[in-house]
Design a protein with these regions (language model features):
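Coil-to-alpha-helix initiation sites in intrinsically disordered, low-complexity, charged segments
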Residues: 2-6, 183-186, 190
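N-terminal type II signal-anchor transmembrane helix
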Residues: 3-46
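A structural signal for short, hydrophobic/glycine-enriched beta-strand patches
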Residues: 31-187
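A transmembrane-helix-recognition feature enriched in membrane-embedded lipid enzymes
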Residues: 187-206
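Short linear elements at protein peripheries
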Residues: 207-221
């Protein structure tokens, strides 16, 4: 019985130690990303500098049940606000089109055109399967090494972190956040996404799934 208690005690110590390490990794990763993006994300038009190219990070247009996805809605509004204020000249809409029935990129372009953005100012990136793919393809595929990322603040910070570590000058324009009751799961996932971002940059050396074929980009003149 005493031997069993010793084994059980060691088992719980291992579990506790694992939880402590796991929590520390998440907190340190979050701090690392936050510091890397410090003073690189902006919430007002007046404060953000000009950058020729905006990069809208993709998300689904609608949520389950058919209602509009507020993350999508607010990102489109932020992109239009930037464009109309002359803070960007072109917009890359980068999203997932891995299956025929699901096309974030086309949905974003359609929404922006309906909101008054000229079609010739929008560039479609159909292979933005992840934040890393979208950010790195802006440079590797479209030749843009200076971008303004357009998403919610928590997402922008991770995108800026990724960009900074791949020699891309990136700012973030923070779209309106969604009410907390709708965004709890997304925010929780973001903590784990930041751990993955650090692994992608410093351990795995991850690159986009498709990035070797260059695509034309409009001339700024």
């Amino acid at each position: 019985m005493n031997k069993f208690k010793v084994i059980l005690r060691r088992f719980w110590k291992l579990i506790l130690g694992g939880i402590i390490v796991f929590t520390a990794v998440i907190l340190l990763s979050n701090y690392w990303v936050e510091q890397s993006a410090k003073e690189k994300t902006f919430s007002t038009i007046e404060s953000i500098p000009y950058n020729p190219t905006g990069l809208v990070l993709g998300t689904s247009k609608k949520v389950r049940g058919g209602n509009i996805n507020l993350y999508f809605k607010y990102r489109m509004e932020a992109a239009v606000e930037l464009f109309n204020a002359g803070k960007i000249k072109f917009i890359i809409v980068s999203g997932d089109n891995s299956i025929m029935e699901y096309n974030e990129t086309r949905d974003m372009k359609k929404a922006l055109v309906e909101m008054g953005i000229p079609e010739d100012k929008i560039v479609e990136d159909f292979a933005g399967f992840s934040t890393l793919d979208s950010v790195l393809r802006a440079k590797e595929v479209f030749g843009q090494d200076s971008i303004t990322v357009i998403s919610q603040e928590f997402h922008n910070k991770r995108a800026v972190f990724i960009a900074k570590n791949h020699d891309i000058y990136a700012l973030g324009f923070n779209a309106q956040n969604v009410p907390q009751r709708y965004g709890t799961v997304t925010i929780t996932r973001e903590y784990f996404a930041r751990v993955k971002a650090i692994l992608d940059v410093y351990v795995l050396g991850s690159m986009p799934k498709f990035y070797k074929d260059k695509e034309a980009f409009p001339n700024e003149e």
